[in-house]
Each structure stands twice: as C-alpha cells, then as structure tokens.
Amino acid sequence: MPSVNFRPMLACSESAHNFFDKLMLPLLASAKLDGIRATVRDGVVYARSNKPIPNKYVQSLFANYEYVDGELIVGESTAHDVYRQTTSHVMSHDKEDFPVRLFAFDHVKNLNDPYNLRLANLEHCLSGEHVVLHNQKYIETMNQLIEFEKLCLECGYEGVI
C-alpha cells in the first residue's frame, strides 16, 4: 500500500481562456505533456490510476526517485505520436532499453508544504539522464499566460497547465 495518500489530478479539457476570471495571479505554468503520469512511492512507479506501471525497465530506472511526481515520455516530448509511443512502451511488461524520461514537476512526500519547498526537495533528489526537471514559468499577467500558451502550442505541446 502506498505510504502517501495521493491521487494525481487530471488536466482540465477546456482552454484556460474559459477560466481567466478564476485564475489567481501570479501563478506557475508549464507546457502540457502528453505522456503517462507517474508517481514513485515505496519504490514502485505508479500510474495516475494508482496501479503500478507494468514495464520492468521503467520500474528499474525510476524506483529510487521516491515521492517524485511527473510524466513519463518516450522519445521527443513534442512528437505527434508521443502518447502512443509512450503507452506502447511503458505499458508493455518486457520492452527494454528505450528512450524514456521522467519529466518531474513535484515532490509529494509532504503535500501540505508550499510548492517552492516541494520543488527544492525535488531538485535535491534528481540526477541521471532519464530524469528531467519540468520547467515552470512564473506568470504575473494574463497577457504573459496567453503568450506562454502560444509559445507552447507553436513548439508542439498540447498547451499549458
């Protein structure tokens, strides 16, 4: 049983433009990735459903990144078929030695801590070629958010989260 009572949230399917009046500035934003959500607890890499990721290679690569929450991506993060490629590899039991990375964006051991402290904990525990800190952009105005969303879309990401 996982030691942390944690269930990842899903991104909203509607555009941020529909929620402008509800957003509280400043905020942190990042490019929305289209991979498989993953959280490491008790040495096991779990999917958003709180079921273990079935791939043995993924489990061996990321089991030591306790409390790291992120998105598994196979290949280029902006490839048109990134979700299909990621699912095909990550959900297969026996595929090995494929170009998978964990784009880490939170450290969920102490969820009541402010995000800046969780981010510091995350930065402290990351190392290796397969783990990448997923950058957050500090946004102070709605115009900055709109421009950041445009940039993310132009680069091939799904949008902003």
Question: Where are the regions that the model predicts?
Answer:
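A generic structural motif
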Residues: 71, 134-137
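Generic recognition of cysteine residues
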Residues: 12, 125, 152-155
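Amphipathic alpha-helical
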Residues: 1, 136-161
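Short aromatic/hydrophobic-glycine micro-motifs
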Residues: 130-131, 157
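Covalent nucleotidyltransferase
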Residues: 17-130
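Short, motif-level signal for alpha-helix interfacial/capping segments enriched in acidic residues
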Residues: 11-17, 82-84, 139-146
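Phosphate/adenylate-binding "loop-and-lid" substructures adjacent to NTP/NAD/dNTP-binding pockets
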Residues: 1-19
